[in-house]
C-alpha cells in the first residue's frame, strides 16, 4: 500500500510542477492550439492556448513508477516488473505517436498533423509489438503479463483467441490487441474536447483500477490457490502504475481545469488511451474496462453513430459529435457538461468495481 501511495503522490507532484514549466515555454514560443471554425463558437476564445501538456503527464507517470520501483528494490518489497514495464512502454509509445502529431501541427504548420495512414501504421506497429511481448516473460508460476484468452472479471476459459493453427491463432490475438489499443486511444482522444474532461475522466478510471489491481494482489493465486483468487502476474505493480496515472492526471488537471491554461494534446490523450488498454490486458479485465471506462465508449460511439447516420440517411443524430459538443450546442455551459460527464464516469466506474467485487464475493462465499 505504501508504494501505491508514493506512486500517486510523486505522479501528482511531478505533473503539477512540470505543467507550468511547459505552459511558460510553449507560450513564449507561441505554440498554441488551433481551434476548428466549425466547432462550438465559445471555443474560439481558446485559440492560442498551449498544447502538448501530455508531456507532463508522461513525465509524472514515468518518474513515479521509477521512484516506486527503486524504493521497492531498496526495501526488498518489490521492483520493476515485466507487466508494469510493458504497459508503461505502450503508454510512452502512443504518447510518442501523439507527440509526433502535435509537433507537426505546431512546428510544421500542418493543422491536421499526421495523416491517417501514418497514424494507422504507428498504432498498428505499437500494438503488434505490445501484443507479441505480452505473451512472453513467464514468471516462476508460468504466468505471462497477458493472456490469449478474452477476459471479463478474469480470463474466460472457454474463449481463447489463439485458436486453430498457431499462425492463425497468433494473428487473431494480435488483431484483437490492435483493435483494443486503437479503440481506447482514439476514444480518449475524442473525449479530450472540453477543459478537464479527459484528464478528470481518466483519473476516475485510474483510481478504480488502482483498487481493482490492488485487490487482485491481495487475493493472488501466487500466495496460494484459494476460492476467488486471481491468476494475474504482477498485480501490485499494475496498481502502482494506475496510481501513478491517477496522480499525474490530477496534477495536470490543476492547470487543465476550466479555463484551461494548457491542453494535453494528442501526446496525452493517445498515451492515456494506451494506459487504459494496457491495464485492461495485463489485469485480464478487457471487457470490464468497457464498463469502467463507459464514458469513453459513449463518446466514441457518438462519433460512429453520427458518421453512420449522415452517410446512410444524410441526417445528423447529434447537433455535433462527439456528444459533449451536442450538449454544449444545446445551451449547457462547458463546465456543466464536464462536471456531469465526470459524474457519469464515476457512476460507470462504481458499477464496474461493484461487479468485480460482487463476483469475488460469489466465489468466496464471504
Swiss-Prot record:
Keywords: Cell cycle, Cell division, Cell membrane, Cell shape, Cell wall biogenesis/degradation, Magnesium, Membrane, Metal-binding, Peptidoglycan synthesis, Transferase, Transmembrane, Transmembrane helix. Signal peptide: none annotated. It catalyses: UDP-N-acetyl-alpha-D-muramoyl-L-alanyl-gamma-D-glutamyl-meso-2,6-diaminopimeloyl-D-alanyl-D-alanine + di-trans,octa-cis-undecaprenyl phosphate = di-trans,octa-cis-undecaprenyl diphospho-N-acetyl-alpha-D-muramoyl-L-alanyl-D-glutamyl-meso-2,6-diaminopimeloyl-D-alanyl-D-alanine + UMP. The keyword RNA-binding does not apply. Belongs to the glycosyltransferase 4 family. MraY subfamily. Catalyzes the initial step of the lipid cycle reactions in the biosynthesis of the cell wall peptidoglycan: transfers peptidoglycan precursor phospho-MurNAc-pentapeptide from UDP-MurNAc-pentapeptide onto the lipid carrier undecaprenyl phosphate, yielding undecaprenyl-pyrophosphoryl-MurNAc-pentapeptide, known as lipid I. This is Phospho-N-acetylmuramoyl-pentapeptide-transferase. It comes from Corynebacterium diphtheriae (strain ATCC 700971 / NCTC 13129 / Biotype gravis). The gene is mraY.
Amino acid at each position: 500500500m505504501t508504494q501505491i501511495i508514493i506512486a500517486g503522490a510523486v505522479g501528482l507532484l511531478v505533473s503539477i510542477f512540470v505543467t507550468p514549466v511547459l505552459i511558460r515555454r510553449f507560450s513564449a514560443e507561441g505554440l498554441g492550439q488551433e481551434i476548428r471554425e466549425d466547432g462550438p463558437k465559445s471555443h474560439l476564445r481558446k485559440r492560442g492556448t498551449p498544447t502538448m501538456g501530455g508531456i507532463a503527464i508522461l513525465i509524472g507517470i514515468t518518474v513515479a513508477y521509477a521512484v516506486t520501483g527503486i524504493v521497492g528494490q531498496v526495501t526488498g518489497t518489490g521492483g520493476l516488473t515485466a507487466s508494469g514495464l510493458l504497459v508503461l512502454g505502450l503508454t510512452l509509445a502512443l504518447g510518442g505517436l501523439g507527440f509526433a502529431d502535435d509537433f507537426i501541427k505546431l512546428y510544421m504548420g500542418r493543422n491536421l498533423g499526421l495523416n491517417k495512414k501514418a497514424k494507422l501504421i504507428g498504432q498498428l506497429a505499437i500494438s503488434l509489438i505490445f501484443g507479441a511481448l505480452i505473451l512472453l516473460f513467464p514468471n516462476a508460476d508460468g504466468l505471462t503479463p497477458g493472456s490469449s484468452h478474452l477476459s471479463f472479471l478474469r480470463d474466460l476459459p472457454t474463449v481463447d483467441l489463439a485458436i486453430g493453427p498457431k499462425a492463425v491463432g497468433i494473428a487473431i490475438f494480435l488483431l484483437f490487441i490492435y483493435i483494443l489499443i486503437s479503440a481506447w486511444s482514439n476514444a480518449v482522444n475524442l473525449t479530450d474536447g472540453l477543459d478537464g474532461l479527459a484528464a478528470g475522466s481518466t483519473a476516475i478510471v485510474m483510481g478504480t483500477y488502482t483498487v481493482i489491481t490492488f485487490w487482485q494482489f491481495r487475493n493472488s493465486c501466487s500466495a496460494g490457490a484459494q476460492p476467488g483468487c486471481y491468476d494475474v502476474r504482477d498485480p501490485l505493480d499494475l496498481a502502482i502504475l494506475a496510481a501513478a496515472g491517477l496522480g499525474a492526471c490530477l496534477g495536470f488537471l490543476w492547470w487543465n481545469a476550466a479555463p484551461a491554461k494548457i491542453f494535453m494534446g494528442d501526446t496525452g490523450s493517445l498515451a492515456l488511451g494506451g494506459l487504459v488498454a494496457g491495464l485492461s490486458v495485463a489485469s485480464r479485465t478487457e471487457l470490464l474496462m468497457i464498463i469502467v471506462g463507459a464514458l469513453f465508449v459513449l463518446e466514441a460511439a457518438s462519433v460512429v453513430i453520427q458518421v453512420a447516420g449522415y452517410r446512410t440517411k444524410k441526417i445528423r443524430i447529434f447537433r455535433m459529435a462527439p456528444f459533449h459538443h451536442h450538449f454544449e450546442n444545446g445551451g449547457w455551459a462547458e463546465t456543466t457538461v464536464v462536471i456531469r460527464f465526470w459524474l457519469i464516469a464515476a457512476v460507470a466506474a462504481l458499477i464496474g468495481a461493484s461487479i468485480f467485487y460482487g463476483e469475488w464475493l460469489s466465489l468466496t462465499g464471504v
